[in-house]
Structures are given as C-alpha cells and as structure tokens.
C-alpha cells in the first residue's frame, strides 16, 4: 500500500501468491499487472452490487478495460486524459513516492495507454478537477452524449498528446 492507503478502503491488499491463485480460479472480472503490482476486480463483488441495483465505477487500466470489453459487458467506458505529458509527469513526481526509474516506467506506460483512448466511448481531459468531475457527472447522468469521433477538437488534442 502507498502512504495513506488502507486495506478495504482504496483496495483490498492480498499477497501475490493469493492473487495469482484467485486469477487462475477465475475470481476476477478483470485483472492486470501494472508497474509491477497486480490489480483485479472481483466478479462476485461486481455481480452483488449490480444485483442490488447499484451502478459501479471501475477505475481500471487499459488491460482491464479490454478484458471487460471482450466479454461484451454492458458498460460506459471513459478514458481520462492528462492535459499534457508534462503535467502528468509533474503529478506523478508530486506524490513523492516514486524513484526516477518508476516515474519513467509510469510515463512510458501512460503513453502506450493513450494509443488505446479511442477504444473508449468517452474522453475527458483532466486539466481542472472541477471541470473533469462535471464532465464525468454529465456522462453518468446521461446529460452529455459525447460522440468523440465527431469532436474534432478532442481528436486534435489526443493526436497532440500522442505526439510527445
């Protein structure tokens, strides 16, 4: 866990051995190894919440999204874009919990993930937290149908990000 994270709050922390056993037992709806750590979403947890009529927001990486997408799972997909690669680097550095090699790996992986952004139904630029939160709310509340393919400004922004 990172500083400030507690078990059962941000994540459920388990040993790598336990995780791999659960992965091999089809315990996870999606899973991925990201920056040397394993992450996954429990099928039972998701199913129980959906059975209770609760909509979920899964904060997952591209690997997990693609696994869920391959299952034809009914969902809205939203890719959160950084305002620039430089600001993303600043945000990672400001956490103060990564060495330079880890920061470089995160940036390399982020650039790779950006190439998959157009597989998502919605794109949000996280330049201002308040504005990004409002955009997210509009999508969730179905107030903003966003056809990203016809949004030339958004496509130009994504092309600019990918050019770094």
Report each predicted region and the residues it spans.
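Conserved AAA+ ATPase "sensor/coupling" helix adjacent to the nucleotide-binding pocket
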Residues: 26-29, 91-98, 139-142
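Switch/connector loops and helix/strand junctions flanking conserved nucleotide-binding motifs
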Residues: 2-4, 66-68, 85-91, 131-135
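ATP-dependent small-molecule kinase phosphotransfer cores
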Residues: 1-56, 62-66
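Conserved phosphate-donor/acceptor-positioning beta-strand/loop module used by diverse small-molecule
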Residues: 56-61, 70-94, 125-128
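Ras-like small GTPase catalytic G-domain
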Residues: 75, 87, 95-115, 130-131
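Residue-level signature of catalytic and energy-coupling elements of molecular machines
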Residues: 19, 57, 110, 124
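NTP-dependent small-molecule kinase module
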Residues: 97, 115-164
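Short loop/helix-cap segments at secondary-structure boundaries that form the rim of catalytic
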Residues: 2-7, 68-72, 115-118
């Amino acid at each position: 866990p990172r500083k400030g994270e507690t078990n059962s709050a941000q994540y459920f922390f388990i040993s790598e051995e336990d995780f791999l056993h659960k992965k091999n037992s089809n315990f996870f709806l999606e899973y991925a190894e990201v920056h040397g750590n394993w992450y996954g979403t429990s099928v039972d947890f998701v199913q129980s919440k959906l059975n209770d009529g609760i909509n979920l927001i899964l904060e997952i990486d591209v690997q997990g999204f693609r696994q869920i997408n391959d299952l034809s799972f009914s969902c809205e997909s939203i890719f959160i874009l950084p305002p620039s690669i430089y600001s993303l680097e600043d945000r990672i550095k400001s956490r103060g919990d990564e060495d330079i090699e880890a920061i470089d790996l995160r940036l390399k992986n982020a650039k790779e993930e950006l190439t998959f952004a157009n597989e998502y139904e919605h794109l949000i630029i996280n330049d201002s937290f308040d504005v990004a939160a409002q955009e997210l709310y509009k999508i969730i509340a179905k107030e903003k149908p966003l056809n990203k393919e016809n949004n030339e400004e958004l496509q130009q922004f994504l092309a600019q990000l990918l050019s770094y």
